[in-house]
UniProtKB/Swiss-Prot annotation:
Species of origin: Burkholderia pseudomallei (strain 668)
Cross-referenced InterPro entries: Aminoglycoside_PTrfase (IPR002575), Homoserine_kinase_II (IPR005280), Kinase-like_dom_sf (IPR011009), Pseudomonas-type_ThrB (IPR050249)
Reaction catalysed by this enzyme: L-homoserine + ATP = O-phospho-L-homoserine + ADP + H(+)
Protein's UniProt keywords contain Lipid metabolism: no
Enzyme class: transferase
PANTHER family registered for this protein in UniProt: AMINOGLYCOSIDE PHOSPHOTRANSFERASE DOMAIN-CONTAINING PROTEIN, AMINOGLYCOSIDE PHOSPHOTRANSFERASE DOMAIN-CONTAINING PROTEIN-RELATED
Matches recorded under Pfam families: APH
Similarity remark: Belongs to the pseudomonas-type ThrB family.
UniProt xrefs under NCBIfam families: PRK05231.1 (NF003558), thrB_alt (TIGR00938)
The protein's name in its UniProt record: Homoserine kinase
EC number(s) from the headed UniProt entry: 2.7.1.39
Length: 331
């Protein structure tokens, strides 16, 4: 999240006329993230998040807002879009599509333990299954076609060694994506960006036997229809990684994957290509972070991420790609 488009008090007052949310009590920008303009909004009716979409068009946005509404109705804890006075789930602010969603309970856990990974794994699988009957389709817009378009744009900014890695991994992933095995992998709506700062945890209720409770997943604006295994790989590459080295933390990875499979067991094809998908997940974010770092957009409060983090993760995944997935984690 970030602030690319400023919203004045007068802008907000006009915008809020289309909502039955009471009076505005507080309004402030959210500095984290890199894609949209986001604001915490407190009214006399509750707490919300206002998002102005900087890249998604009004034609693309229905997939995202209706997906969140669909998941919320199926018991998945996600922000629910708030309907406007005309019944629609988004409108236009400063010439850009914008929406208000409910604010989830809890706080991000930026140093997750095994117990957090268990909660995330189970809910991610529930989310995948809940999305099976979602009728709208939107591809993951940061997948192979985008990588092919973006790598030439960032190539002038990287070293020769990095360029060789970018182009070599792109060729590897293109071959994987073209394979029959890839085509057979289960798919459906995916979050595609489920990092530890896109989930919230609340205090567990007494006598539940749980030390933590997942408040929910949010920031679905990179979501798309993709292979479920890609969504799992993206999640594991963030929640279950040793930050200094990029290596997987075996205990957290085992916990997340076991928990996921209590809800949806992996297929044989998913187990076979776990290494390839871990590489795909790392590559996607290395490419996007290089792009955002070297070709940034003007923004208030923008905090770009370090591209080197996912370069390290990708190199780690390639170094261990020859090994089969650990049987204790993926059976």
């Amino acid at each position: 999240m970030a602030v690319f488009t400023a919203v004045s008090d007068a802008d907000l007052a006009l915008w809020m006329r289309h909502y039955d949310l009471g009076d505005v009590v507080a309004f402030r920008g959210i500095p984290s993230g890199i894609e949209n303009s986001n604001f915490f909004l407190t009214t006399t009716r509750g707490e919300y998040v206002l998002t102005i979409f900087e890249n998604l068009t009004a034609g693309q946005l229905p997939f995202y807002v209706h997906l969140m509404s669909h998941l919320a109705k199926h018991g998945v804890p996600v922000p629910a879009p708030v309907a406007r006075d005309d019944g629609t789930l988004f409108g236009e602010l400063h010439g850009k599509p914008a929406a208000i969603v409910t604010k989830l309970e809890g706080a991000a856990q930026l140093a997750p333990g095994v117990e957090h990974c268990v909660e995330v794994g189970q809910m991610l699988a529930r989310m995948h299954l809940a999305g099976r009957d979602y009728p709208r389709h939107q591809p993951n817009l940061r997948s192979l076609p985008w990588w092919r378009d973006t790598v030439p744009a960032i190539a002038p900014f990287v070293t020769g060694e990095q360029r060789a890695l970018l182009e070599g991994e792109l060729a590897h992933q293109a071959a994987f994506f073209a394979s029959d095995d890839y085509a057979a992998l289960p798919e459906g709506p995916c979050h595609c960006d489920l990092f530890r700062d896109n989930a919230l945890f609340a205090h567990a209720e007494p006598d539940t036997g749980h030390s933590v409770r997942l408040g929910g997943f949010f920031d679905f604006y990179f979501a798309g229809c993709d292979k479920w295994l890609f969504d799992v790989a993206v999640t594991v590459n963030d929640w279950c990684v040793d930050l200094p080295t990029g290596a997987l933390d075996a205990a957290r990875a085992d916990a997340l994957l076991r928990a996921y499979q209590t809800v949806r067991p992996f297929t044989a094809g998913e187990r076979r290509h776990w290494g390839d998908m871990l590489r795909a997940g790392a590559y996607r974010f290395w490419v996007s972070r290089l792009y955002d770092f070297h070709l940034p957009r003007a923004a208030q409060m923008l905090k770009p991420h370090d591209p080197g983090h996912f370069e390290r993760i990708l190199r780690e995944r390639i170094a261990h790609a020859g090994a089969p997935p650990e049987t204790h984690a993926c059976n």
